[in-house]
C-alpha cells in the first residue's frame, strides 16, 4: 500500500522537469545571449520565453548602430517569432564597444522603452566568452 501512495506522488514531481526540459524551452538555449556590434550601439535588454512558459525565461542583450531602439526590436521579432519565442523589453540604453582596447561603456536610456538595468547588462556581457576580458563601466 505504501508503494501505491509513493507512486501517486510521481506525476507531481515529474511535471516540473517535463516543462523545464521540453523541446519548446530547449529552443531558448539556442538563442545567443549577446549580439552587439563594434563602436557606439543602441541596445535593448530583453526577456525571452516560449509562449505559455513565462516563468522559464532568459535575458538577452541585443545592440546595433541604428537610429532608434524600435529598429532593434523589429530585428529581434524577425529572429525569434518563427521559433515561437516571445520577447518582453526590459529597457534600453547605449553601449560604446571599443573592441581594440577591450573596453566598454554602458550608459543612457531608451526614449521608447525606458532605461535598462545597466548592471545586469554588464553581468550578461561579462558571462559571454567574447567579452570576458573586457573592462566594462556602467553609468546610470
UniProtKB/Swiss-Prot annotation:
Gene3D superfamilies to which the protein is assigned, alphabetical: Janus/Ocnus (3.50.20.20)
Annotated transmembrane regions: none
Highest taxon in the source lineage: Eukaryota
Keywords recorded for this protein, A-Z: Differentiation, Sexual differentiation
GO molecular function: protein histidine phosphatase activity
InterPro entries registered for this protein in UniProt: Janus, Janus_sf
Active site location: 69
A Gene Ontology term for the protein's cellular component: cytosol
Family: Belongs to the janus family.
Protein name: Sex-regulated protein janus-B
Protein species of origin: Drosophila orena (Fruit fly)
Protein encoded by which gene: janB
Amino acid at each position: 500500500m505504501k508503494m501505491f501512495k509513493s507512486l501517486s506522488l510521481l506525476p507531481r514531481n515529474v511535471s516540473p522537469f517535463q516543462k523545464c526540459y521540453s523541446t519548446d524551452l530547449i529552443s531558448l538555449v539556442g538563442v545567443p545571449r549577446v549580439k552587439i556590434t563594434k563602436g557606439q550601439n543602441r541596445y535593448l535588454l530583453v526577456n525571452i520565453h516560449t509562449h505559455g512558459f513565462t516563468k522559464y525565461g532568459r535575458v538577452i542583450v541585443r545592440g546595433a548602430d541604428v537610429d532608434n531602439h524600435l529598429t532593434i526590436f523589429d530585428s529581434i521579432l524577425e529572429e525569434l517569432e518563427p521559433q515561437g519565442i516571445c520577447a518582453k523589453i526590459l529597457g534600453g540604453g547605449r553601449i560604446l564597444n571599443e573592441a581594440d582596447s577591450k573596453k566598454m561603456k554602458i550608459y543612457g536610456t531608451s526614449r521608447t522603452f525606458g532605461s535598462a538595468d545597466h548592471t545586469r547588462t554588464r553581468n550578461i556581457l561579462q558571462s559571454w566568452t567574447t567579452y570576458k576580458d573586457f573592462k566594462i563601466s556602467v553609468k546610470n
